[in-house]
């Protein structure tokens, strides 16, 4: 049966990628359908109960700046907030929150159900309908057909998912949910390049069976941070601490004695796991010289006794899991509520994607999230928003939005995926961004909200708040650059208190703010300082960063300007690189395989040398000269 309503965009999967994709397309005015095998699991946190972290928090802020839901839902469901790297420079500071699973999921569900232009439907998708080289819709498990010119596939770990506990295994998308076997088979038939990856999760513990008195308590920050640019600490529910304990030599002995029962080390699991979130057995094997590893006990919520022991993800048999847990200080009598497990799943080579996250081989079909080889809620949400927005733009006949590496961590993420591919689950870090000084958490809105407004992602409330903030920054910056501090009007004691030494001559307040030890608040406390100082902490933060890091930021912007020419020089999509004289066979093969969109992308493909880039530039120049000559003769 064909469903009577025709949609503009269909999103398959209701995880972090799918929910952001559906919300984005609907905000842009497209009739959007979100299909999930179970509406009750929309926005579910399948693994750890936390959002953010180094690099990841930057992505969450960018999603928020573009009108996405993740940051706001975290503010409503977050039960502990911290700023990581708070003592370091602003480029690497990152927000991280523990979230109440129930509250977070409810916040996402509320937004989905109240979003205009968005329809929800509970059915597993078994098939894609394709006409020629374009997707035309999907078919569910009961044979119900939905039609749309754009489909965003966000299948997570469900494609041919296989759960392992010891040497036992069974098909599942995650614990308690069925896998997407028919859909996985259909994608194989479409000849999309694919592979297998693996991830895992630790056993969950009952807090009532844990001795927290022997552990180190880890409270959240005070004052409590917020994630969304529109958020406030008043939105947060009650705050809870986390606790830290650690493994010991007995723990490690138990693991080593049972590695032959591990599906990872017995050859049962073929998929590659995440390097930066390894299982406890992988840690013991890879870091054999360490006799202890930290374990962080994270509460799952305000209304449950369930504890997430971050650091002991494992797929060992249950009896070994129990022995591991009870060898750890404070967990000697711990009761396991759910066993840990590993899950293998299909992913598709992201080098088969355009910068818009549309597949190169099937028009209108977009991939986002773990299907592209990434790991993490935040990476999924960012891809989902971009894929949903670009699906909507395509339906509306508008040009795709492909953020550059110097514009957003989202640009870094997508560029890494489509030019380099993945050999293991990809996780975002600040170190992956060469322009990270200008890609900070604190300025995500200044970088992206105007673009979001242009695309139709940003509503009137967010836009008004953003414009007010931007105007306040510009106004106060201008005032500081024109107001003079005169040493004859400021007592020597105040000069030394604020500036660390006396003023030798009059100076502009903006110049004084450049000094490392000087803050905006301390400057405004000087006698004769401009009246009515700015009180918005977000505005003050931008003033201080602009003053103290302007030289570094200017140098980075010069580097960006040099790189922009390569990023804006496009390569023909149908170019046969065998036609480019001088390229080696190896380079020709790689370029024909990856089909880079720009010279910049080509240069980031492994094995493509500067000499090869020079040959491409010569070819483009000759082509342009030939085209001009033809036009003149015509």
Swiss-Prot record:
Main function: NAD-binding protein involved in the addition of a carboxymethylaminomethyl (cmnm) group at the wobble position (U34) of certain tRNAs, forming tRNA-cmnm(5)s(2)U34.
GO aspect biological process, one term: tRNA methylation
Signal peptide from the UniProt entry: none
Keywords (A to Z) from UniProt: Cytoplasm, FAD, Flavoprotein, NAD, tRNA processing
SMART domains, per the entry: GIDA_assoc_3
GO MF term list: flavin adenine dinucleotide binding
GO CC, one annotated term: cytosol
Organism in which the protein naturally occurs: Azoarcus sp. (strain BH72)
InterPro entries: FAD/NAD-bd_sf, GIDA_C_N, MnmG, MnmG-rel, MnmG-rel_CS, MnmG_C, MnmG_C_subdom, MnmG_C_subdom_sf
Residues that hold FAD according to the record: 13-18
Subcellular location as annotated: Cytoplasm
Source lineage: Bacteria, Pseudomonadati, Pseudomonadota, Betaproteobacteria, Rhodocyclales
Protein family (similarity comment): Belongs to the MnmG family.
Subunit structure: Homodimer. Heterotetramer of two MnmE and two MnmG subunits.
Residues bound to NAD(+): 273-287
PROSITE patterns with a match to the protein in the record: GIDA_1 (PS01280), GIDA_2 (PS01281)
NCBIfam families for the chain: mnmG_gidA (TIGR00136)
Protein name stated in the entry: tRNA uridine 5-carboxymethylaminomethyl modification enzyme MnmG
Cofactor names: FAD
């Amino acid at each position: 049966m064909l469903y009577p309503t025709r949609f503009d965009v269909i999103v398959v999967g209701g995880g972090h990628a799918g929910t952001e994709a559906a919300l984005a397309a609907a905000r842009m005015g497209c009739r959007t359908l979100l299909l999930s095998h179970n509406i009750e699991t929309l926005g579910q946190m399948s693994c750890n109960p936390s959002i953010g972290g180094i690099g990841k928090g930057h992505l969450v802020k960018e999603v928020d700046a573009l009108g996405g839901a993740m940051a706001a839902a975290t503010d409503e469901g977050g039960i502990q907030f911290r700023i990581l790297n708070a003592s370091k420079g602003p480029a690497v500071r990152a927000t991280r929150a523990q979230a109440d699973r129930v509250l977070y999921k409810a916040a996402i569900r509320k937004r989905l159900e109240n979003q205009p232009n968005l329809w929800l439907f509970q059915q597993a998708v078994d098939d894609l309908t394709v006409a020629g080289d374009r997707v035309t819709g999907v078919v569910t498990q009961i044979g119900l057909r939905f039609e749309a010119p754009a489909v965003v596939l966000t299948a997570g770990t469900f494609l041919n998912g296989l759960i392992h506990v010891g040497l036992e295994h069974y098909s599942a998308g995650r614990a308690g949910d069925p896998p997407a076997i028919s859909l996985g088979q259909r994608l194989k038939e479409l000849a999309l390049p694919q592979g297998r990856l693996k991830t895992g999760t630790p056993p969950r513990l009952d807090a009532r069976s844990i001795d927290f008195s022997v552990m180190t308590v880890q409270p959240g920050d005070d004052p409590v941070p917020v994630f969304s640019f529109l958020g406030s600490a008043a939105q947060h529910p009650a705050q809870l601490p986390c606790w830290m304990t650690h493994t010991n030599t007995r723990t490690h002995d138990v693991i080593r004695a049972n590695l032959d029962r591990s599906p990872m080390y017995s050859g049962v699991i073929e998929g590659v796991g995440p390097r930066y979130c390894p299982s406890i057995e992988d840690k013991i094997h890879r870091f054999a010289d360490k006799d202890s590893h930290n374990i962080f006990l994270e509460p799952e919520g305000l209304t449950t006794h369930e504890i997430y022991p971050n650091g002991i993800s494992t797929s060992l048999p249950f009896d070994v899991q129990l022995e591991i847990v009870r060898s750890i200080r404070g967990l000697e009598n711990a009761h396991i509520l759910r066993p840990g497990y590993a899950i293998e799943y299909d992913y598709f080579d992201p080098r088969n994607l355009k910068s818009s996250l549309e597949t190169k081989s099937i028009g209108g079909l977009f991939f986002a999230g773990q299907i592209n080889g990434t790991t993490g809620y935040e990476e999924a949400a960012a891809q989902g928003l971009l894929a949903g927005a670009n699906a909507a733009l395509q339906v509306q006949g508008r040009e795709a939005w492909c953020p550059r590496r110097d514009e957003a961590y989202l640009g870094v993420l997508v560029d890494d995926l489509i030019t380099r591919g993945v050999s293991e689950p990809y996780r975002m870090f600040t170190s992956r961004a060469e322009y990270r000084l200008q890609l900070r958490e604190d300025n995500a809105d200044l970088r992206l909200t105007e673009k979001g407004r242009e695309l139709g992602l940003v509503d009137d409330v967010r836009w008004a708040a953003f414009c007010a903030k931007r105007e306040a920054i510009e106004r106060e910056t201008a005032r500081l650059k024109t107001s003079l501090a005169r040493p004859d009007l400021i007592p020597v004691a105040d000069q030394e208190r604020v500036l660390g030494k006396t003023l030798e001559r009059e100076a502009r307040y903006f110049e004084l703010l450049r000094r490392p030890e000087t803050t905006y608040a301390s400057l405004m406390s000087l006698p004769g300082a401009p009246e009515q100082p700015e009180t918005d902490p977000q505005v003050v933060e931008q003033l201080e960063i602009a003053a103290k890091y302007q030289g570094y930021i200017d140098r980075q912007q010069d580097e960006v300007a040099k790189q922009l020419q390569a990023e804006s020089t496009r390569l023909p999509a149908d170019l046969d690189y065998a036609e480019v004289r001088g390229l080696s066979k190896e380079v020709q093969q790689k370029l024909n395989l990856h089909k880079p969109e720009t010279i910049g992308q080509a240069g980031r493909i492994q094995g493509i040398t500067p000499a090869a880039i020079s040959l491409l530039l010569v070819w483009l120049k000759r082509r342009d000269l030939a085209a001009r000559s033809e036009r003149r003769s015509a």
